[in-house]
Amino acid sequence: MYMFEYKAKTKWLPYYDEFPLVYVIKATPQEFYGANLHYLTPKKRVMVVQRLLEGRIDIPRTCVHKYLTSHIDGYLLDLASEEWDTAILLPIENFVRNVKGSVGKFPYTKELVWEETDETYYERIKARRVVRGYGKRKDTQMAK
């Protein structure tokens, strides 16, 4: 799981999180797909992380986004699985939107985001979690 600062390409996005907390599902050097857990309420984040630690991916589809590596501002903070329980409760989500014809970004409340995510909460991506050649031994063993 990673934390980072992100400046989205906003042409098609109604809003985005400037400080995502992302479980990466697929990656290439130019982009990656991942589940931003900030789109979920803290209580639902706990359930998602519990499943991840059990070796299961069970994530609402609306949390999954494409991130361009060229739009990351700074470094990716790689979080060990032992830190996930703490990281999901940090109140660092910052949703913003751009308004056509206006300069700057406008805040978009997390409560509105959570409400929208709740509407499609049961449309989920499910898979077995696989860790290859990375992480601690127990993470790799758990995923087998």
Regions found by a protein language model. Give the residues of each.
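Intrinsically disordered, low-complexity, charged/polar segments
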Residues: 40-144
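Short coil-to-beta transition motif at edge beta-strands of beta-rich domains
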Residues: 1-13
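Intrinsically disordered, low-complexity segments enriched in small/polar residues
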Residues: 2-4, 21, 31, 37, ...
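Basic/aromatic-rich interaction segments and small domains that mediate binding to polyanionic partners
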Residues: 12-51
